[in-house]
């Protein structure tokens, strides 16, 4: 499956979950270099959620971690604190970003923004 097809499948699953939860979101899928493959904002999702979803996807693709797992690592004095400080806002350490792996290798990053963390899942899946 090519990356665009994978991105469309992921976006459809995210939107279905968000629709069921009645929480409009934005979703972004990027390749391993951080280039946008797909962006989608559901009607009613906050306008800023599109940008945040891209930052979350970018971070997950390049750092290869869930963005929620970065939170303790980017605090002052911690190992990845400089990453956030010098990135010009490009990286995100808020929940909602995951990397996608195929055959053990990261192929994309996915970011979801606009929903409440407890409602919309961004589980990493092997494709």
Region roles according to the model:
Residues 1-127:
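Flexible, solvent-exposed loop/hinge segments and secondary-structure transition points
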